[in-house]
Amino acid sequence: MGEGALAPGLQLLLRACEQGDTDTARRLLEPGGEPVAGSEAGAEPAGPEAARAVEAGTPVPVDCSDEAGNSALQLAAAGGHEPLVRFLLRRGASVNSRNHYGWSALMQAARCGHASVAHLLLDHGADVNAQNRLGASVLTVASRGGHLGVVKLLLEAGATVDHRNPSGESTASGGSRDELLGITALMAAVQHGHEAVVRLLMEWGADPNHTARTVGWSPLMLAALLGKLSVVQQLVEKGANPDHLGVLEKTAFEVALDRKHRDLADYLDPLTTVRPKTDEEKRRPDIFHALKMGNFQLVKEIADEDPNHVNLVNGDGATPLMLAAVTGQLPLVQLLVEKHADMNKQDSVHGWTALMQATYHGNKEIVKYLLNQGADVTLRAKNGYTAFDLVMLLNDPDTELVRLLASVCMQVNKDRGGRPSHRPPLPHSKARQPWSIPMLPDDKGGLKSWWSRMSNRFRKLKLMQTLPRGLAANQPLPFSDEPELALDSTMRAPPQDRTNHLGPPEAAHAAKDSGPGNPRREKDDVLLTTMLRNGAPFPRLPSDKLKAVIPPFLPPSSFELWSSDRSRTCPNGKADPMKTVLPPRASRAHPVGCVGTDGAAGRPVKFPSISRSPTSPASSGNFNHSPHSSGGASGVGSMSRLGGELHNRSGGSVDSVLSQIAAQRKKAAGLCEQKPPCQQSSPVGPATGSSPPELPASLLGSGSGSSNVTSSSKKLDPGKRPPSGTSATSKSTSPTLTPSPSPKGHTAESSVSSSSSHRQSKSSGGSSSGTITDEDELTGILKKLSLEKYQPIFEEQEVDMEAFLTLTDGDLQELGIKTDGSRQQILAAISELNAGKGRERQILQETIHNFHSSFESSASNTRAPGNSPCMAGWVRPEETVSSRR
């Protein structure tokens, strides 16, 4: 506390202790007591101020302190006032109290050489090894002042000579002793030339070679700096090392020369074996500095002068060869290896070798050279990684470097183990465990399999760079002379190498021969394109089955054509369902339009529902601009021309979809001003005959999980709404965001479609409709929020989408959702869905109108059936539907 804030009585007590006025201190501490006859001479009488302070009433505390934390006892001890110190101790003053700088009363007495006061404090339990915030002990401050009697008293009381704090105790500052300067009592006595104290400390076993950790100076160097020959002689006689070097690479002899102490220099000259460096030697850098500068000649001179320099280590345990490998200087690496540098030495921090450093920094030529020179590829760093493991951790590893290390590792495995590492190990393979590559069970792991997968990854990445951006491998190029409709779609790669779904035979033949048109070669590339466009990482190698990444729930600006409001009020007051699905690609066993379609059905395509004019099943042979009607096959055919860029947008963002819709709306605005009549669209199903067609199994992908149409052979009535179709009042905006993973074979495709069809059959009550129910949409929302565990709650309470959009926080709690974070996620989704409904409805109506106008304008330019281009999987109007097997 500041002195100005002290009470008058406290100020009087501190002043009396500083001056040794025991009488005033007694009157302040013991109101009503008799004056003490032992007041020291020279002490000023307190006078009327003390009397007024005493008359004020309250007694003064004995441990009061000033603004620096100095107590009354410390002030009395520093002044050497023994009677006052004795009186304060009798009144209960704390003997080990510290001021703000860590000084105690004993340190104050030792600093000033008051032996009697120090003895009195020691008798009352003062800490003889106390240290201040700078790490100076009681013995150090006494030695600095040259107080031989106090030093002897402290040593006899048990003071530590070198006070190295072996117990690890902390100083008053809170820092450990090792963080301080490390000045011992002997160094303090030598620095100030107290020869008698030096002799006493040496007799008590002081270390003459203790050095200050910051500057590296020893007591002998301090004596040489001071110029005390007698002190230097004492230290040398007690074993001081004259060859000790400080941080400036100087000995005590050089210090004496610099200070021009000729007598000291003459005495130390014959004792010192480390001679001073010449000016040229001082200017010459060491081998590490020469490597950093890239000075080949200087490194060669240093290595020629002393070959041991090539294996020196720095503070991190790194060698010159490691530094050269990091910097990528092949000539220096060759020079060091020729000078017998240890290629397999590991640093002390991470355990890396020169080969690991060169591998990690991508210095391929150095890696080749070190491998040719016999560097050990099996050495592991402290984290267990080898050089091959490090190159696999790089974001963009060099293919040749990976191949080089892999071949060497496989050769080592073959030479040492006799079998590839991915096979079941023999009994003697335990000896290879410390260096063998981590492997998976059986033939799914091992070095060879690992390299095979990595090679596939690099090959496919290079192939993708040759394709047009966003072009899927299994889809035909858009017509260059016709407008492209920028809509979003979701496609799935074909599972087998079939070219008969590419439309015209000549196009299929060309696609089969050429690289970009081969579905088998590039079916995984489509998924790679989707994954890269979505910004998804590669958790596994591309040769494995890549699963589509489902993005989180989109922000309020999200809008997707297939996820907007699916009910629309017509001028006549009826509801218009807005969500339908285009005809699927027909299987090879059930040709519906295009010649020779793929039996496994390619990627299912999702489009927004489009309101059309009434359909006429009887006029199936005529052109109808509704692709959803029984006679809409030609409409679907024309759709392929308009949807050129349709398949290139798989996995795109919602913002890109909006921009594409806006561009298309501008293009199609002037084509037709006629507004389509609002009428219910017919169910999905391409047909050219008067009888309704049968839907082949595993053709349509719908719902949040892209489930397929049921495999049951129920027929769709084009005049009726599917019984489990979308409700006319449903207002869900749950989008289907991602494509299904690309299966690798027909068997997998069939099993997946069968199981998903069975699930959809259950949810839709056995209907073969391709539309999405409220339950599917609600399930999709919960899946996107990663809250599938709450789905049974909504199913049990029969909560549909319309009820879901009205839920509040209290409703969710009543349903049993107790987690605050989960409720907030659901409420945010509900708010987002409700907020964007009006805007989505308006944009969707305009898009549908423009879409309809485009179809009407293309009706007048319909091509001849033989010349009309037909995309893969699309139906032709002149072909009939074959019956299901």
Swiss-Prot record:
One of its GO terms (cellular component) is ciliary inversin compartment. Residues 415-439, 491-522, 563-775, 855-885 are annotated as: Disordered. Residues 608-640, 689-713, 722-739, 750-770 have a biased composition (Low complexity). One of its GO terms (molecular function) is identical protein binding. PROSITE patterns: ANK_REP_REGION, ANK_REPEAT, SAM_DOMAIN. GO terms for biological process: determination of left/right symmetry; heart development; in utero embryonic development; innate immune response; kidney development. Widely expressed with moderate level in brain, skeletal muscle and testis. Expressed in renal tubules. The modification Phosphoserine is found at S650, S734, S742. Residues 876-885 have a biased composition (Basic and acidic residues). The ankyrin repeats are necessary and sufficient for NEK8-binding. This is Ankyrin repeat and SAM domain-containing protein 6. It comes from Rattus norvegicus. The gene is Anks6.
